[in-house]
């Protein structure tokens, strides 16, 4: 199994990207990894791993590039060439920590949208207080969604949670402004009715305040609401850890307490670090495409590659297609 990796995407490229790829190649003997990007910058970081190859490119899609224009004009960019490896069947999946919009465009225009999918969805796995985590989709691939799209998101999330995350009977929740059945706008009300008709384990509406409590294994939303909720969770977590740091360094007694609590705080931070779950999968394409966080370090890239491998091993794309045809 070959996995293509955009070595030039992200804040710490190419060093941390290559390190993560080396970790994954050493850990999973059944994969080969193709690093795509500027070979002169990549080569110094590659240290003797036989199952790592490099494809040289001389263009990079930058964070501030307009996504669709960049994908169409920068044909020799690391991201576009990465997607072409998948399209041509030389790679089974691909990963990038680069420009999110450009990756979605490359996924749609190069890898291609699956025939049975109306709208792709961007789906990270976020941590919960019980350590189980939950799949959240859509968080920004499409700001608008029809009820039928939300139903498809639920099915895709179900397949992923069951086959990759090992949840036997995933609980599906619909993000809404209240838990009562009739809450929400016309889109969510209609989506609620559609989800009730499926064979999925639909538990009803869920509120944003309960997401980190582990109320559901899969939460579906339109891309606008999903992205707002995701950014709120990220911002709140950063603010809380910043506040804790200020409090625990504010005096001698606080610093002594911090020394005692340091192992516990490190464990808490690790538990809430969603890079441990991999990247955000772009569901609805012809092959697994993973968006790693822009600030990904080697460990995050390792987990994104692990995630891509598991999606291929468990044939998540084929299973989604079969489930949609059966629905």
Curated annotation (Swiss-Prot):
Record-level GO BP terms: fatty acid biosynthetic process; phospholipid biosynthetic process
Entries under SUPFAM superfamilies matching the protein: Isocitrate/Isopropylmalate dehydrogenase-like (SSF53659)
Pathway linked to the protein: Lipid metabolism; phospholipid metabolism
Catalytic activities: a fatty acyl-[ACP] + phosphate = an acyl phosphate + holo-[ACP]
Keyword DNA-binding: no
Top-level division of the source organism's lineage: Bacteria
UniProt GO cellular component terms: cytoplasm
Keyword hit for Chloroplast: no
Enzyme Commission number: 2.3.1.274
Family annotation (InterPro entries): FA_synthesis (IPR003664), Phospholipid_synth_PlsX-like (IPR012281)
Gene3D superfamilies reported for this sequence: Isopropylmalate Dehydrogenase
Keywords in alphabetical order: Cytoplasm, Lipid biosynthesis, Lipid metabolism, Phospholipid biosynthesis, Phospholipid metabolism, Transferase
Principal localisation: cytoplasm
GO terms of molecular function: phosphate:acyl-[acyl carrier protein] acyltransferase activity
Role according to the record: Catalyzes the reversible formation of acyl-phosphate (acyl-PO(4)) from acyl-[acyl-carrier-protein] (acyl-ACP). This enzyme utilizes acyl-ACP as fatty acyl donor, but not acyl-CoA.
Database matches in PANTHER family: FATTY ACID/PHOSPHOLIPID SYNTHESIS PROTEIN PLSX (PTHR30100), PHOSPHATE ACYLTRANSFERASE (PTHR30100:SF1)
The family this protein is said to belong to: Belongs to the PlsX family.
Subunit structure: Homodimer. Probably interacts with PlsY.
Protein name: Phosphate acyltransferase
